[in-house]
């Protein structure tokens, strides 16, 4: 891994100052840097400046609000989220997702904002400079073709974040600040299906906080599969939230990660009102298969990753159904 190239560092004290600093060209936000800095060492980007967000007061705060909702600053560490008593009790899917990221050392530093906004990944992209140059680079960075689908005019690098799908099924919203002020969007709207430009943040915008509503009658869980449990990104990850009314599915949300260029909600309206049985599980598998787009973006085979995604989709809903 190469040494870092030269860049300036700004350390603003307020969100407003951070937004102003990010308005400059070739400037990137920096949280803990557990994803960004290794990529820069590989030559994946050459920013003129990094805006260090760790000095902004209150950005790491986790609090429950008067209406029972949860507010998490984008600077909160994954360790703090995973170990927070209220989150473990009321929003366990979020704690599960945070606790499943990488290893303990990573979680002690890595932030919520960084995990949500992490770069997409691909076996043709996450390589050294000499490896990529010998392969003619790729459409995501410096090249003119996607090696995953050669004739495509878009990048198919895959999003592998764990926390996003959990927040999506919990109906969480993202608070974004930027030159035009503040806006709030559903977490799913932070992303688009484009490996090269998977975030919808505009120039100068940054993620400030996440708000999660009270769970009410919903229960939720997150599960993933990876090669090495200690550190690896998910080959496939699934979050689900369920409302059960007797033997009837009163509400269901399912979100997937590790399969597409963005974490995606699976349209599951066809299952509402029915029982959760083998037929329903097969319907869910078909819906997940239709939503997902597993390609050769990792060294693990496509067929295996697809089978794992379908299997854990059923597993998560099975667990929620049996627990209610």
Swiss-Prot record:
Chain positions recorded as FAD binding sites: 29-36, 111, 115, 118, 162, 224
Catalyzed reactions: oxidized 2[4Fe-4S]-[ferredoxin] + benzoyl-CoA + H2O = 4-hydroxybenzoyl-CoA + reduced 2[4Fe-4S]-[ferredoxin] + 2 H(+)
Family annotation (SMART domains): CO_deh_flav_C
Pfam family, any one: FAD_binding_5
Keywords: 4Fe-4S, FAD, Flavoprotein, Iron, Iron-sulfur, Metal-binding, Oxidoreductase
Cofactor binding, per record: Binds 1 FAD per subunit.
Leader sequence residues: none
CC cofactor: FAD; [4Fe-4S] cluster
Function: Component of a complex that catalyzes the reductive dehydroxylation of 4-hydroxybenzoyl-CoA to benzoyl-CoA. Reaction is not reversible. Is a key enzyme in the anaerobic degradation of phenolic compounds.
Name of the protein in question: 4-hydroxybenzoyl-CoA reductase subunit beta
Record gene name: hcrB
């Amino acid at each position: 891994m190469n040494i870092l190239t030269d860049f300036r560092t700004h350390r603003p004290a307020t969100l407003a100052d951070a937004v102003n600093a990010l308005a400059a060209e070739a400037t990137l936000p920096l949280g803990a840097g557990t994803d960004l800095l290794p990529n820069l060492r590989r030559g994946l980007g050459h920013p003129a400046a990094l805006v260090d967000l760790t000095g902004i007061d209150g950005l790491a705060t986790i609090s429950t609000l008067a209406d029972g909702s949860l507010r998490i600053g984008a600077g909160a560490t994954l360790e703090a989220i995973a170990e927070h008593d209220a989150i473990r009790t009321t929003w366990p899917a979020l704690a599960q997702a945070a606790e499943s990221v990488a290893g303990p050392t990573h979680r002690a530093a890595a932030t919520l904002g960084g995990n949500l906004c992490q770069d997409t990944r691909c076996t043709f992209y996450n390589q050294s400079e000499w490896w990529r140059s010998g392969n003619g680079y790729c459409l995501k960075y410096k090249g003119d073709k996607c090696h995953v689908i050669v004739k495509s005019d878009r990048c198919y690098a895959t999003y592998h974040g764990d926390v996003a799908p959990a927040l999506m099924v919990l109906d969480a919203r993202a608070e974004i600040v930027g030159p035009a002020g503040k806006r709030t969007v559903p977490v799913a709207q932070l992303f688009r299906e484009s490996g090269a430009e998977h975030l919808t943040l505009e120039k100068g915008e940054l993620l400030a906080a996440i708000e999660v509503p009270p769970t009410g009658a919903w229960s939720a869980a997150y599960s993933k599969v990876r090669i090495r449990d200690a550190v690896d990104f998910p080959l496939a990850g699934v979050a689900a939230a369920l409302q059960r009314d007797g033997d009837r599915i009163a509400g269901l949300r399912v979100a997937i990660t590790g399969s597409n260029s963005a974490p995606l909600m699976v349209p599951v309206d066809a299952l509402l009102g029915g029982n959760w049985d083998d037929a329903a599980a097969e319907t869910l598998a078909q819906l997940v298969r239709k939503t997902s787009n597993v390609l050769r973006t990792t060294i693990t085979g496509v067929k295996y990753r697809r089978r794992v995604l379908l299997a854990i989709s059923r597993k998560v809903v099975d667990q929620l159904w049996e627990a209610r």
